């Protein structure tokens, strides 16, 4: 497999073509951003953690019947993925009130929700990825009705599978963001699953083990990312 031209450079990843149709080469970066790009920095070895952790979790999800774009882990920072036509929506699943939900509803951060909440956000950096609903998504043509239903159902299924793993790792899955795309008419999970896209809290201390440490200047960001990977890898080593 040959790495081709860079197609796109985002906040956290670079995407390249390959010499094989329908396959992309993804490189994970150490760059970090928050508040829609207003805050910028670097988190040491973030790219390594996010690449390797995503690969581990994608493999587990595939075994449970959840289709992902993951094909192969190449090295510490790079993986091969299936080319997808991305659905321009973020699916956010919340188990505990935190971040924008706590602020929007005026509830204390850490409130355990009686059931998981699924939210949709329109992917548009210029607009700040606004919170939208199913009606908006259908009216604007961002997704077909059956795909909209499927990505929300997959979000809940992924939530259940990740919680099983993370609970064994002593980690609370507070909330997380997913992105989906389509290839040959089939919906696949894309993007990544990492401390960049999830809120992880230590089960005993409620210490934050995710990008909130960068957002809120809590320090020990690199250590938190590495700790999540270490714990998940330990749980999945067999």
UniProtKB/Swiss-Prot annotation:
Q: What is its EC number?
A: 6.3.2.6
Q: Which cysteines are joined by disulfide bonds?
A: none
Q: Which residues form a coiled coil?
A: none
UniProt cross-references to Pfam families, sorted A to Z: SAICAR_synt
Q: Which UniProt keywords apply?
A: ATP-binding, Ligase, Nucleotide-binding, Purine biosynthesis
InterPro entries to which the protein is assigned, alphabetical:
SAICAR_synt/ADE2_N, SAICAR_synt_PurC, SAICAR_synth, SAICAR_synthetase, SAICAR_synthetase_CS
Determine if Ion transport is one of this entry's keywords.
Answer: no
Its pathway, per UniProt, is: Purine metabolism; IMP biosynthesis via de novo pathway; 5-amino-1-(5-phospho-D-ribosyl)imidazole-4-carboxamide from 5-amino-1-(5-phospho-D-ribosyl)imidazole-4-carboxylate: step 1/2
Q: Which GO terms describe its molecular function?
A: ATP binding; phosphoribosylaminoimidazolesuccinocarboxamide synthase activity
Write out the GO biological process terms: 'de novo' IMP biosynthetic process; cobalamin biosynthetic process
| UniProt key word Nucleotide-binding | yes
Reactions performed catalytically: 5-amino-1-(5-phospho-D-ribosyl)imidazole-4-carboxylate + L-aspartate + ATP = (2S)-2-[5-amino-1-(5-phospho-beta-D-ribosyl)imidazole-4-carboxamido]succinate + ADP + phosphate + 2 H(+)
Top-rank taxon of the source lineage equals: Bacteria
Similarity comment: Belongs to the SAICAR synthetase family.
Q: Which HAMAP family match?
A: SAICAR_synth
Name this protein carries in UniProt: Phosphoribosylaminoimidazole-succinocarboxamide synthase
The species this protein belongs to is Desulfitobacterium hafniense (strain Y51)
- Name the gene that codes for it: purC
């Amino acid at each position: 497999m040959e790495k081709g031209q860079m197609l796109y450079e985002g906040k956290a990843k670079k995407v390249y073509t390959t010499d094989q149709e329908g396959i992309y080469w993804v490189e994970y970066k150490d760059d970090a951003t928050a508040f829609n790009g207003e805050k910028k920095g670097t988190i040491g070895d973030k790219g390594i953690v996010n690449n390797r952790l995503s690969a581990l979790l994608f493999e587990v999800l595939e075994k449970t019947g959840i289709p992902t774009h993951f094909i192969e882990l190449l090295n510490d920072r790079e993986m091969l993925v299936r080319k997808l036509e991305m659905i321009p929506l973020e699916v956010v699943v919340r188990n505990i009130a935190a971040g924008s939900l706590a602020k929007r509803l005026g509830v204390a951060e850490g409130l355990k929700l009686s059931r998981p909440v699924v939210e949709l956000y329109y992917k548009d950096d210029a607009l700040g990825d606004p919170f939208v609903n199913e009606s908006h998504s259908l009216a604007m043509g961002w997704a077909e009705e059956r795909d909209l239903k499927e990505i929300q159902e997959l979000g809940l299924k992924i939530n259940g599978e990740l919680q099983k793993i993370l609970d064994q790792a002593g980690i609370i899955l507070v909330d997380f963001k997913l992105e989906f795309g389509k290839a040959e008419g089939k919906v696949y999970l894309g993007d990544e699953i990492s401390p960049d896209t999830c809120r992880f809290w230590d089960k005993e201390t409620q210490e934050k083990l995710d990008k909130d440490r960068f957002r809120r200047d809590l320090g020990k960001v690199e250590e938190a990312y590495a700790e999540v990977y270490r714990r998940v890898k330990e749980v999945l080593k067999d």
